[in-house]
């Protein structure tokens, strides 16, 4: 979800205004996923690098997170949409953490066979995820819970935040940037990439479906012929 700040600048608005516009666009893309039967949607909402942002901007982002969860919870449940997060949210404000955890618990209890799982990447960065995975593997080796010889790529996946979700088939980045920026680097090994100059608040359902259509026409060989 990239380009909120630049969108705000283009409209002579504050960065917080841009983030709000970006937040409001999330539901449009969620609806698009439901319309074309996509089962998982991961949104990069707050990266480990976002702590470098100005204090007021971070406060606005945390407030928007709370508002999003509280405002959309009924709609998500009524449409049988499960909400989860990946990343370490322990450094977030306590009231934000409480809202996130309560919403996730409620959707888990009420959405038994979800048509879509929405995953918000919050205080997420792959380098941080990898660090934590390596530490936890080392702890388990030290405690004789695992044998080093049994460690393979499938084993490593069980120590990642995304252990319960499939690897992404397609990664879409808005705003004209052509890099992954520390996002799901292990999981994206064979993901298709789609880059667009459109800023996130302007990224419509039609734009999303166009990206999916282009992806559908690609020949994924996974290193083979």
Predicted segments, located by residue:
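Flexible, compositionally biased loop and terminal segments
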Residues: 1-225
